[in-house]
Amino acid sequence: MDFLTDGIMALTWQQLVMYAVGITLIWLAIKKGFEPALLLPMGFGAILVNLPFSGVVNQTLTGGIQANGVIEWMFHVGIEASEVMPILLFIGIGAMIDFGPLLSGPSLFLFGAGAQFGIFAAILVAALLGFRLTDAASIGIIGAADGPTSILVSQVLGSRYIGAIAVAAYSYMALVPIVQPFAIRLVTTKKERCIHMDYNPKSVSKIIRIAFPIAVTMIVGLVAPQSVALVGFLMFGNLIRECGVLGTMSDTAQNILANLITLLLGITISFSMRADQFVTKDTLLILVIGLFAFVMDTIGGVLLAKFMNLFLKKKINPMIGGAGISAFPMSSRVIQKMAMEEDPTNVILMQAAGANVSGQIASVIAGGMVINLAASCDQANTVMAALTIMGKGMAGIFAAILIILLLVWILRKVSR
């Protein structure tokens, strides 16, 4: 009867820690409502993959028999071999996004670029702390505030920390209502937070709405080829939404596809949360660097808005810059809530929403930039390479966004 106790005897303290991590993620999903569609399956999966001799991961049984585990198979097929799961999720995300507020106020595009600063600041910090370049780049992409992008970039770059990166990315996305107000108050005054902004939306024609995702895909594909999979599927989802002839498919992409892929992605990514890989001091460092990235994203966007105000007669509420992260629509709602806390009559939701969807585009451009630059830089001199990625990455994002701005201006002129 010893076989009945084999599993118990094989338990390690690291596996017990992972059970606690899994239960905590499940608790955060159910009790606090933090990204439940992903944290709940991720938490349950963390328990599954850390059970001794678990049948969900590949095992060699007595007699040399190989037993294939379903979660390990899903990880190899859906993430490692093709990154198909995070990429397919972008179809659903694109179908959810309304670019109308952004297209009616194209200057909001700039805040999406400014709010990617945390990515590159975090890459530099990770490099200074001794992470190899590809791992530092993967950790930095947590600052994209975009879970699928974080997973895809870390997988393409072959990071050893994909599980910790995924947990950090989605956990901090859920904590946007806590992290962003703290960061914004660090660099703004009450007077700045009370600035009112006029909202005079210009109608956006159907032609522009259809042409925009096609043109953005082509431009970004030429400027940052490594972003094509990310931005292409995002814009394909948006084209399904805007074309007007695929209403049922648009609803399916927004609801059934997005929910199903998110569920599968959560439980699949848990394969990389095995105790021997996850319970390390590096995981704690990644969580700290990820938080730093989120804070610096917000600060970068806010400081860009404050810089622009030096040259504008009609001032921008600097909090709008903080909405330029990819956490949509959470960030725009947080900004509106903060504005009304300072002044109950201050409504800046639509401007914040425009900056927020700009962040969705900028984050996938940043993901492609990071992949390309990290692969081409000198892997030996990590800190210098991180500085190079920082300079070229931010310049590349702003260049791509400015080209898209020019495109929108041309489309609006032509459609009149």
Describe every region a protein language model picked out.
Residues 1-11, 16, 62-67, 182-211, ...:
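Intrinsically disordered, low-complexity non-transmembrane regions of multi-pass membrane transporters
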Residues 31-39, 58, 74-76, 96-111, ...:
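Interfacial helix-loop-helix linkers and transmembrane-helix boundary segments
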Residues 77, 81-82, 91-96, 110-121, ...:
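Alpha-helical membrane segments and immediately flanking helix-loop junctions
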Residues 168-245:
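Membrane-embedded hairpin module used as a gating/binding unit in multi-pass transport
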